[in-house]
Amino acid sequence: MSRSAWKPPFCHPSILKSVNNALNKGFVNMAIKVHSRASVILPNCLGLKFAVYNGKDYIPVNVNDQNMIGHKFGEFSPTRKFTGHSGDKKATRR
């Protein structure tokens, strides 16, 4: 089920505080560290840099595009590494 229409989009209070500080003090080039992958990217985040935690590392995310607004931070930092499928054993054997 999706979120109720009467509720506002969820964004962790620490992210809102960091975004407001970055905009007010002019720290636009510094990356804001984000642990809350469930937080929604809001319109006031446009033009800022974020570092989203995937459980191991911080993945850099630049919010440059208008289409990123409304998506969640976790969508842009994958938690699993795809190593690829194994090759065909018959093709390598002679």
From Swiss-Prot:
Keywords: Ribonucleoprotein, Ribosomal protein, RNA-binding, rRNA-binding. One of its GO terms (cellular component) is small ribosomal subunit. The keyword rRNA processing does not apply. GO terms for biological process: ribosomal small subunit assembly; translation. The keyword Cytoplasm does not apply. It comes from the Bacteria. GO terms for molecular function: rRNA binding; structural constituent of ribosome. Belongs to the universal ribosomal protein uS19 family. Protein S19 forms a complex with S13 that binds strongly to the 16S ribosomal RNA. PANTHER family: RIBOSOMAL PROTEIN S19P FAMILY MEMBER, SMALL RIBOSOMAL SUBUNIT PROTEIN US19M. This is Small ribosomal subunit protein uS19.
